[in-house]
Amino acid sequence: MANRERFSRFIGFGSGADIFAPETPYGLSKRVIANSIRETPDWHNIRIFGVFDENELSTRFIKASILRYLNKEPMQIHTDRIMDFFYMKDLVSVVDKYLTEKDPPKEVNCSYRDKHTLSEIASQINELGHHRVGINIEQAGMSFYSGKPLEMDVPLIGFSKGLFDTFQILSDKGTTV
C-alpha cells in the first residue's frame, strides 16, 4: 500500500458472489478482496447482492420487469429465487454513514429484513399500476441470493417504497423498452 498515508479509510464494495459463487473468477476476486479488507485496519466492506433504481441498466431484473409491465408485456423470470435488492438511495445513505461515522462496522450486507422472491417482486410490480401482465417463470426451482439484514442505524426508504418510487419515475417518463 504505497499510498496508504493519502487516505484514512477505505470502503470496498463487495458482492454476494464472494459467498454464493466463490468458484467463479468474479466470486473468487470478491472473496480475496473481502478477506484483505477483514485483515486491514480502517478498511470496510459494503456487500451488495443487488441494487436498483430507475437508472440501472434496462436488462436488470427490476427495471426490465417494470418496463415490460409498462409495455403490457409479460415479465420474465429465468429461475425463481429469493433475492436481496437494495434501493440505490438506501445504499447512498449507508455510504454516507461510513464516511461520517467515527467507527463504522467492518462489514455490512446491503440487505433488508424482509426477503422477496423474484416472483413476489414481479407480483408487486403488477399491483403498482392499473392493469395486469403475465409472469413467466422459465425454469422450476428455487434458490437464494440473500444476506443477513443490515445492522446499522441508518434511515432507510426500504424495498417496497423504493420499488414504488422507481415505478413512478419510469412510468412518469413514459419509458419503454
Residue ranges and their predicted role:
Residues 6, 39, 71, 103-104:
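Residue-level preference for short coil/turn positions at secondary-structure junctions
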Residues 9-14, 44-50, 84, 109:
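Structural signature of the Rossmann-like NAD(P)-dependent dehydrogenase/reductase core
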